[in-house]
Amino acid sequence: MNPSHPAVHPVEAPPTDVHHAPRVRMKDYQGMPGTLGGLALRLGQFCFAVVAFSIMLSTDDFSTVTAFCYLVAATVLQCLWSLALAVIDGYALLVKRSLRNSLVVSLFVVGDGVTATLTFAAACASAGITVLIGNDLRECDQNHCGKYETATAMAFLSWFMVSPSFLLTFWLLASR
Amino acid sequence: MNPSHPAVHPVEAPPTDVHHAPRVRMKDYQGMPGTLGGLALRLGQFCFAVVAFSIMLSTDDFSTVTAFCYLVAATVLQCLWSLALAVIDGYALLVKRSLRNSLVVSLFVVGDGVTATLTFAAACASAGITVLIGNDLRECDQNHCGKYETATAMAFLSWFMVSPSFLLTFWLLASR
């Protein structure tokens, strides 16, 4: 270069499509942690579990049947878990933060799997006993069959909303 | 080259580590379709479901309780499904063929999910009624409590062996 003849030659900027080595990464499906669909699922789980718990508690003799006591315990656990996850989802949405940490997602999968299994087991046991009382023994005149049925149905609905959460989070963990 | 002076010079073969553009692909975990572990899981599911079915059928009054009839139906379905999958796994092992077709894996996931849910629901309903008869009403002297308990436990064990099949196949589908 000739120092006595300095010149600034305008040069084109290099193309900036560097992309930072794009990883193949799945998009956010609604219902995954940290999405609006996920928050809606959590709130649905919580509401159905609260209704199931309240209805079962409003019968005075639920404690004489082990399965109904178990339903109350399982719905309490489901309420606490879904409420905690709803708060986390709401926070993630507010601060626009993605919940994609491997450890966090694993924790969600295990928690969802355990609570879904417990809630479903409680709902099935209660359904078996409700059908036994109502259809097989025909003793609905001495028992709160309607309330038992409604509480069982609400527990099933709560499980029905935990399952997509579990499957989508498991999918997210597997497809990382 | 001088044609009057032919010579064969031994040359080194080029390195053959061409790798054929290695795709990122998960390895075969034992328990997935087409593995020896998968075949063992299928045979376990089948055996436990057959034992649960046989024990429940050996009680003469199972048909008076809806949940016990449902257990019989669910274990029959589980037997058929697990036997079919065991045959497919055995065939895949014999001809050393990998079961990695997307459609086939999806079918396995749906079938495993449905049969696992049905078997678990039947086991939970039977468990609820068995506990009701044995612990809450204390009428084991008039009922086959031991047989009910054993059949329920076998159904739970069958479900316990379907779950890893379902989770591993779902993992395989998600991580493709």
UniProtKB/Swiss-Prot annotation, chains A, B:
Membrane protein topology class: Multi-pass membrane protein
Keyword Transmembrane: yes
Record-annotated membrane-spanning stretches: 36-56, 68-88, 103-123, 153-173
Stretches of the chain found on the membrane's Cytoplasmic side: 1-35, 89-102, 174-176
Ranges per topology, Extracellular: 57-67, 124-152
Xref: InterPro entries: CASP_dom, CASPL-5
Keyword Hydrolase among UniProt keywords: no
Subcellular location: Cell membrane
UniProt KW keywords: Cell membrane, Membrane, Transmembrane, Transmembrane helix
GO cellular component, one term: plasma membrane
Family as reported in the entry's similarity comment: Belongs to the Casparian strip membrane proteins (CASP) family.
Quaternary assembly: Homodimer and heterodimers.
Name under which the protein is recorded: CASP-like protein 5A1
Native organism: Ginkgo biloba (Ginkgo)
